[in-house]
Structure formats: C-alpha cells, structure tokens
Amino acid sequence: MARIFWFRRDRRLQDNLALNSCAAAAIADGDKMVIPVFWFNGSDFENLSGLRQHSLTESLKALDESMGSNLEVIDSPDMGALAAYATSAKVRFIHATESFDPEGIAEQRALASKLKGTGIELVLEDSYYAVKPGTVAKPTDGSAYRVYTPFYKAWFQIGWSAPAKLTKGFDWKPRSGKSKIPSPTKSAPFKVKAGEAFALETFRRFQSRAIGDYSENRNRPDLSGTSHLSHALAHGEIHPRTLLAPLSDLDGHTVFRKEIAWREFYADVLYRNPHTLDDYYEPRFKAMRYDTGAKAKSKLERWQSGTTGFPMVDAGMRQLLTTGWMHNRVRMIVASFLVKDLHLEWQLGAKWFEQNLTDFDPASNSHGWQWTAGCGTDASPYYRVFNPILQGYKFDPQGNYVRKFIPELSHILGPEVHEPWLLVDGLQNGYPEPMLDHSVERDESLARLEEIKVK
C-alpha cells in the first residue's frame, strides 16, 4: 500500500528526514510507492504579489521535475480536499515535516481532524530548522530564552545531525491527469529562479566567493556579500543542516552560522508565543501613540512605493517591488523609518513584506520587525532610531545601491546621492523632496516613548 508524502516548506529531496522516513516505511510495506502531494489555497495565492506567485510556481516546478513530473497538486481552501484525496488513494499514512508556526500548526490540526474516523494516520517528523523550536531551554528551569546570545550558545551546544541523502529503493506514484502546477495570475518583471538544484548551486557559489568576507561585507547592500539563500530556506529548497555542515571556526563562517541561528531563535520565540505573529511581544507598546487615518494612509503609501524622499529608504522599497527581495541591513532601515519617523505600527510594514517578499518567513518577518520597532524579544531599544541618511553614507558609501534602484538619481555620481536636495541639480529628474525632517520625527518618537514608560 502506497504512502503519501505531503510537501510543505520542505520542497527538496536531499536532507529531508521526513521524506526518508516515508520512503523507508513504503519499502518496508513492500509496496515501495510514495505519492508526492502539495496542498495550497488558491485564494491565498491570488493575494500574493506577482513575484511571490512566480516564486512559488517555479519552486513547485523544480520540485516536480526532480521527481519525474509526478507531484500531485491539490488546490482547496481547507484540508478536506487533502483528506478526501488520501481516502480515494486508499492510503493509511500521510507523512510530512512538522511545522511549528501558527499557520502550519493550524494546518496540521485541521488535517488530523479531517482524518478522524478514516483510519489514516498523519505522521509528523523533523522540522524546517537545525534544532526543533521548543527544544532550546534554560538548564536552570526549562524556560525559554528571551535573549539571542545565550540562546545561540545553548543551540550550538545541542547541535544537529549531518545532512542525509535521499533514501533509495522507492518509487514515485505516477501523477493523475487532473493535477497541475498553479499558474501565476500576475506578471513579474523577470524570471524567478528557484528549486533545490539552484539553491545548492547558490550555496557553492557563496562558499567559494563571499563567505570569507561575510563578516565585513554582509551589511553592504552595494556589494554581493550575502548568501542569497533566504528564498531557498523559506521554501525549504535547502535545509539549514546542509548550510551548517561545512562551516568551520573561521570568522566569516562563524558569523554566517550566527545569522542562521537568528532564524532559529525567532522560530523558537514564535512557537512559544504564537500571538506574536501579529501582536506585540512587549504588550506595553500597544499603548504607544501611533498615527492613523487618511494622513497615515498617505504616509504608508509613500513608504510602500519608495517615494519618501530619503534615498536609502526608497532604494530598499523599490528593490522589494522589482526583485521580491531586500538586503537585511536595508530592511532594518526601512522598518525603523516606518515605525519611528512615520509613527505607524510595525504590523503595517510586516504585512507589506508578507505580500511582496519571495523569502517570506513568518517568524523572521514578525520578529525582525519587532526587533527594529523595539517591542520584540532581545529588541533593539526603542530609542535607537536609524538615521536613514547616515545609514546610507555608512553602508552604501559610493551610492551605487541607491543609483541602481532610483534612476532619477543616476546623474549624481558620488556619495552625495544620499542628500540630493543639497545639490543644485539633485532633484531635476523628479525625485521628491524629503517628506519629513528626521531630527524632528526622532524627537517626536522619543516623546511618545516617554508616554508609555512605567512611572
């Protein structure tokens, strides 16, 4: 009797422990058949940006091709269709990688509920992380870590298994004629590359070209100093174990390992505090005075479109719209600007990122925003307000990043591009004046913080 493997955010064949378990069980059953299935909600798919739609589609195409075009795709608003498919396929087991974020947990519970009385068991194993969320805890009382550094030390001490190769000796069940990969309903400005093979190639390129200087260059958006693997991790086209396995104690390797651990830390925090997906980790910040109404909506739209008049902010927002990705340093800059210069709630920015980032990860997105907003675990203090102009001079010293994404400023050849309003011809191509005075809004932000301080 065949077994179903439900692909989720683990769209790869290598180093997939849950898939290996499913394959081994199918071999032991004597049937040797595995039915690969992917479930998605077409309504949710429709709400994604064009780049996110294309990103998912290309990821699924690559997965499908890697298994001989046998992936069964189920489009349904709920888990009933997956349960019905399993019943019609006459299987007794559905295997999957366990999810630890609120949406993934809800999917698991919904499917288990639909399977009640069918005789079909849902088998959940492994996770999307090197160490399962909820595992790392203080040795004194078993409680969770609120601060990253001690979490990292405990996480590193626990360790992880070596990457596992795909189990041999099983077969994919041929796909039915009805199933097909979803087609994007929105356009994208370029062809998105995705899939396990591309992820492994990207990692090899990073190892050979950039990891040695990662510590120095990772904060420079004008350089290709990062791994560009966040998309692959978000889709599960590569597992963190694969990235961690070859790392040594060299400086660049250590810093890269610590960046992977930030992803694991945020996953742990969200698992233990599921309400923080869209609510404050530090509840007192709910009382912060944020701007609302028509004026706030107008400010949000200028931020979203990259027309604030602050080049570093606008370059980041335009990079997001044109590529579906944004450099991590710039994510912090635009987040600080939204919360502390525009006085808007972090959830508005997090939602925009969710709609547009091809590397969207629920835990990293929510808690990355809360870190910058000063209301999360181990957060940057609220009174730390990024100066978007100085950040530009520091991390894009020649202005190459800004010129790449803001063509209206391409005529300004040096670092002066970060303050074009100071030049006679700086705004001649229609780039807007700054929409606010940063020093004034910084003071306003700190004044609002005083209002919620515990007396």
Language model features with spans:
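Trp/Phe/Arg-rich N-terminal binding region typifying the photolyase-homology
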Residues: 1-163, 252, 318, 364, ...
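Short, contiguous strand/loop micro-motifs
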Residues: 6, 50-51, 98-99, 215-216, ...
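Short coil/turn segments at secondary-structure junctions
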Residues: 6, 47, 300, 429-432
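Hydrophobic alpha-helical segments, especially transmembrane helices
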Residues: 9, 109, 264, 330-332, ...
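Generic alpha-helical segment signature
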Residues: 56, 196, 306-309
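Short secondary-structure transition/capping segments
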Residues: 78-90, 114-124, 169-182, 376-381, ...
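Glycine/tryptophan-enriched, flexible segments
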Residues: 120, 141-288, 395-396, 400-455
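Active-site-proximal binding-pocket segments
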Residues: 224-247, 251-408
